[in-house]
Structure formats: structure tokens, C-alpha cells
């Protein structure tokens, strides 16, 4: 296999910022991360338990923990070469986030001092680092093999140049005489005869990484989201008018250190058409013998995903239960689940389509009849002899259809991660999959559309997606 990357922070500052921000965000939340390279992009994956230190090299990611998935398009790099014999040309490894981030910080200092150098990243074999693997993990106990094959240890070799400007110790000062052009008076100007020279310093680092076997890589699957029972909120930007207030709303629950779970609830009232007036978002604490509701009263945009917008390809509609449980009496598994990263690329188009559908519903004229869950049809009676029980059923049904509620119970510590992500990015979307999971989606821009080589097709944006499985059922 072969891996070689080149990035230049001075020539492409927006692309470098995307890469640097992603690594910095993951390092601020996790100690280790999985780097998965393929022909299309780099994916950075991390959970609180993404470690291969166990002797059995078991599964890396667990479904009951918050999973952080970040994608970086391949055209962020000036050179992106990945050669592998695996499916989709994949190379997967685990690395320490702080070690990788420290190299980027050093590169930042070099750029700030005026040097414009390429950062080259190569995967290097390190046989001397693997000499003790067989000794430490091999052997038998009572004739039984107690260990499995260890993961090979390699290095990400990172190099870049720094140009240091130096000058000679015996610089002479020459006094040159002349005449000022404005007033014709003689003037004297002192100029330095500097004996300047440049010194090139080559910085080289080796970041240890642990290559994953094919079976381990296969077990790392992006969580699926049920797009039938999903509500998506476009949150106010942190630098906007309501950003500071919404950040305080998210962090309000952090005041209570003894709270373990929060109840996240989103309500959309269909009868209102004004922006922000038809959406409610609540954080409910209902434990320790007390009940608390924290409501956001500011503007909020929402998009409800419907079944009509789903693909008809069954191979893409596979369901993975994020918490690994299917309780009795729960809704049947619906073939309408996809990773958030694959479906968010056209969110603006879906929002426009939803608004058009909503306007069409307002203008549609239908028969005045309502059917309940048992199949009974209630038709408006103009004779005035409608029974009261029919009216009550109609009112109850109308109230249910006038609003849509999505709620989920998650861990409070996972919600604290969301507050950190919200403060770091401008464009954030919160998605609530009813009684299943919660997703915090952050988009990373790559400059304006004019900066793209293809003006008609904008460049792929970077994504940071935090998947949160429910901590318990409603």
C-alpha cells in the first residue's frame, strides 16, 4: 500500500483551514481517532472507546457511544495518492490526536513567520517499532494461545521546510546625499548594506499509527438515521444575532452536574406559516424527583423529512439500530435509513421542496372528511345533527395533525459535546430521529463559489457529524 499527501496552507488557506479545524476539533474531544483514506476522501472517526489497546483487538467502535464522523474531500490536498488492495482502495489506521495536532501547530508557526512550504505526509513502514510485538503478545499458556496477531505499527512521516532570514554581523551603513524633489533642499539618507542570506530548515516528524486489519475496518460502519421520523433544525449561527443566546440555551443544562439524561423535544405546528413561529425546541430534565423544562423562544428554521423524498434503491436503505436494541412494541424497521453524511449534501434543495409542498397543501381543496386509526370516516354533516362524540374525535384528530413532535432521551455528557461543536462552527444542523437518535451536523466552507475550478459545480464541503444514540426509550 502507498499513501502520500501534500497540502499548502499559504497557497490554499481555505482548504488548509478545513483540514486544520477538523483535526483540532477531534483532538479537543477525543484522545484517539481512526483515519480512513480512500480514493474520494479522508474520513476521521472517533468515539470515547475507539482504542485498540486490548489484547484481543476487538471491535473499535461501539453503538452505545457518541460517534464523531468527519469527512475531508480529496481535492483539499494538492496531491492525494492512495493505493491499496482493499475494497474502495481503503487504508485505515488509528492514531493519537494530540501527536498529530502538535505537528500542525508547528506548521502554523512556520507559516506565520512568512514561510510558504508544502506539508508532505507519507505512510512509512517502521520495522524497528514492531520487533517487540511478537514477544509481548505472543506465547502460550498451558498449551493455549493467549493472544491474537498484533496490529502493525507504522508512521505518518510529515515534513515541511522553514526559511530563516539571517544577516551578516558587520552590516555597513552608507550615507547617500541628494536633493529633495519637493523643496529642492539637500538631504541625506542612511541606507543599510545588509549582507542577507537565507537558511532552510527541514522539519521532520514521525507520528505513530496502528494499521487496522480488513475485518476491523469492516466493522466500522457509519450509523444510519431513520429519515421517516426525523426533524432537522438549522440552528442560529454562533456569530449571528441570536448565536450567543442559543449557545446559552444549549449550555444551560451544564449547571446541574448531577443530571445524567436529558429529554430533547422538537415540535412543529403546521398551521402557522410565519418563519420561526411554528417551531419549538425544549430540553427537559425529569429525574432526581424534579422536573425542569428549558425552552428556546427565539427564531428557528426546521425541515421535516418525509417518505416521498427517499430513494427507491433498496440496497441503500439498510437499517442499523444505533443502540443495538429493538424493544417490544416499537415501530417496525422501515427501509428508509441512511448516513447523515450521504444525504445532507442537498439540504437546501430539500428545504425548498418542502416549502413548495407545504404551500400546495394550503391551496388544496378536498372533501371535508377525516378517518381515524380504526378506519372510521367522519364526514362534515351540514344538517346540524352531528353527534358530539364525532365532533370530539374530529377535534382530537385535527390537533394531532396540526403538530409534529420528535423527541429522544440522550446522555447529558453527549449534549455537552454538542455545545462545544456549536461554538466552533457557523453552519450547524440539529436532527432528532424520534426515539432513536440525535445528530449534530456541522458544515465547513471552502471559500466562495468563484474560487472553485468548476463554477457550476461547487466544491464538496467538509463535514463533522456527531451521532448520539438514545440512552433509553421514551
Curated annotation (Swiss-Prot):
Question: Where Phosphoserine occurs, residue numbers?
Answer: 452
**Main location per UniProt?**
nucleus
Highest taxon in the source lineage: Eukaryota
Q: Does the keyword Cell inner membrane apply?
A: no
Q: Where in the cell is it found?
A: Nucleus
The record's GO molecular-function terms, alphabetically, read:
DNA binding
Annotated GO biological processes are: DNA damage checkpoint signaling; double-strand break repair via homologous recombination; meiotic DNA integrity checkpoint signaling; mitotic DNA replication checkpoint signaling; mitotic intra-S DNA damage checkpoint signaling; nucleotide-excision repair; subtelomeric heterochromatin formation; telomere maintenance
User: What's in the keyword line of the UniProt record?
Assistant: Cell cycle, DNA damage, DNA repair, DNA-binding, Nucleus, Phosphoprotein
User: What PANTHER family has UniProt attached to this entry?
Assistant: CHECKPOINT PROTEIN, MITOTIC AND DNA DAMAGE CHECKPOINT PROTEIN HUS1
Q: In the UniProt entry for this protein, what further remark is given in the free-text comments?
A: Present with 414 molecules/cell in log phase SD medium.
Q: Which family does it belong to?
A: Belongs to the MEC3 family.
What is the protein name for this chain? DNA damage checkpoint control protein MEC3
Report the source organism. Answer: Saccharomyces cerevisiae (strain ATCC 204508 / S288c) (Baker's yeast)
Amino acid at each position: 500500500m502507498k499513501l502520500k499527501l501534500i497540502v499548502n496552507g499559504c497557497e490554499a488557506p481555505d482548504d488548509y483551514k478545513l483540514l486544520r479545524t477538523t483535526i483540532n476539533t477531534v483532538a479537543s474531544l477525543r484522545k484517539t481517532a481512526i483515519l480512513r483514506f480512500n480514493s474520494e476522501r479522508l474520513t476521521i472517526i472517533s468515539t470515547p472507546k475507539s482504542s485498540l489497546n486490548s489484547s484481543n483487538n476487538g471491535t473499535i467502535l461501539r453503538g452505545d457511544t457518541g460517534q464523531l464522523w468527519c469527512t475531508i474531500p480529496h481535492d483539499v490536498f494538492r496531491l492525494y495518492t492512495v493505493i491499496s488492495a482493499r475494497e474502495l482502495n481503503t487504508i485505515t489506521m488509528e492514531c493519537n490526536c494530540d501527536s498529530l495536532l502538535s505537528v500542525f501547530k508547528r506548521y502554523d508557526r512556520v507559516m506565520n513567520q512568512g514561510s510558504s512550504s508544502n506539508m508532505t505526509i507519507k505512510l512509512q513502514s517502521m520495522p524497528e517499532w514492531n520487533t517487540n510485538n511478537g514477544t509481548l503478545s505472543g506465547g502460550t499458556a498451558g498449551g493455549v494461545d493467549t493472544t491474537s496477531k498484533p496490529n502493525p505499527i507504522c508512521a505518518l512521516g510529515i515534513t515541511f521546510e522553514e526559511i530563516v532570514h539571517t544577516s551578516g554581523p558587520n552590516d555597513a551603513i552608507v550615507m547617500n546625499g541628494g536633493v529633495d524633489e519637493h523643496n529642492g533642499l539637500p538631504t541625506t539618507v542612511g541606507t543599510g548594506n545588509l549582507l542577507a542570506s537565507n537558511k532552510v530548515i527541514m522539519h521532520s516528524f514521525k507520528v505513530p499509527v496502528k494499521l487496522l486489519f480488513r475485518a476491523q475496518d469492516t466493522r466500522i460502519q457509519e450509523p444510519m438515521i431513520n429519515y421517516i421520523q426525523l426533524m432537522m433544525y438549522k440552528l442560529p449561527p454562533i456569530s449571528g444575532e441570536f448565536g450567543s443566546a442559543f449557545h446559552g440555551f444549549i449550555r444551560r443544562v451544564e449547571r446541574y452536574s448531577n443530571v445524567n439524561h436529558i429529554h430533547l423535544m422538537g415540535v412543529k405546528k403546521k398551521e402557522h406559516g410565519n418563519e420561526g413561529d411554528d417551531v419549538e425546541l425544549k430540553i427537559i430534565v425529569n429525574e432526581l424527583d424534579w422536573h425542569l423544562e428549558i425552552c428556546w423562544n427565539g427564531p428557528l428554521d426546521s425541515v421535516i423529512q418525509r417518505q416521498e423524498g427517499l430513494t427507491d434503491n433498496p440496497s441503500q436503505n439498510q437499517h442499523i439500530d444505533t443502540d443495538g436494541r429493538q424493544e417490544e412494541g416499537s415501530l417496525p424497521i422501515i427501509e428508509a435509513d441512511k448516513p447523515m453524511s450521504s444525504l445532507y449534501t442537498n439540504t437546501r434543495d430539500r428545504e425548498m421542496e418542502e416549502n413548495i409542498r407545504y404551500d400546495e397543501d394550503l391551496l388544496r381543496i378536498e372533501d371535508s372528511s377525516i378517518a381515524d386509526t380504526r378506519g372510521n370516516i367522519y364526514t362534515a354533516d351540514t344538517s346540524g345533527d352531528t353527534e358530539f362524540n364525532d365532533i370530539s374525535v374530529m377535534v382530537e384528530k385535527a390537533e394531532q395533525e396540526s403538530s409534529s413532535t420528535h423527541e429522544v432521551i440522550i446522555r447529558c455528557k453527549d449534549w455537552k459535546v454538542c455545545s462545544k461543536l456549536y461554538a466552533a462552527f457557523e453552519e450547524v444542523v440539529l436532527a432528532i430521529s424520534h426515539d432513536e437518535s440525535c445528530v449534530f451536523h456541522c458544515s465547513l466552507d471552502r471559500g466562495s463559489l468563484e474560487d472553485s475550478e468548476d463554477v457550476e459545480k461547487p466544491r464538496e464541503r467538509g463535514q463533522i457529524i456527531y451521532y448520539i444514540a438514545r440512552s433509553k426509550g421514551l
